[in-house]
Every structure is written in structure tokens, then in C-alpha cells.
Swiss-Prot record:
It comes from Xanthomonas oryzae pv. oryzae (strain KACC10331 / KXO85). Belongs to the UPF0391 family. Keywords: Cell membrane, Membrane, Transmembrane, Transmembrane helix. It is found in: Cell membrane. It is a multi-pass membrane protein. One of its GO terms (cellular component) is plasma membrane. This is UPF0391 membrane protein XOO4217.
């Protein structure tokens, strides 16, 4: 999931440089949502992990 967030972030940067504001905004929003979901799942998995 973090991989997809990074892909959408790169697409947003490229679109912003080329001047496609609508595409850049959409890609940025998708990347942000995926990154937040990744962080939430990472924190949950840290607390649910059993003791070693």
C-alpha cells in the first residue's frame, strides 16, 4: 500500500510540473489517503503483535 501511495505521489509531482492541476490534485488526494491508511494499519499491527 505504501508502494501505491509513492506511485501516486510521483504522478502528482509530474502532473504538477507539467501544469495539469486537476490530475495533480486528484493524485495527491489518492496518495494522501493511501498513506494515512498505511500508517493506521502499521500502528494497529504493531500493537497486535504478540510478545517475542
Amino acid at each position: 500500500m505504501l508502494h501505491y501511495a509513492m506511485i501516486f505521489f510521483v504522478i502528482a509531482i509530474i502532473a504538477a510540473v507539467l501544469g495539469f492541476s486537476g490530475i495533480a490534485g486528484a493524485a495527491t488526494n489518492i496518495a494522501w489517503i493511501l498513506f494515512v491508511v498505511f500508517l493506521i494499519l502499521a500502528v494497529i499491527s504493531m500493537f497486535r503483535r504478540g510478545k517475542v
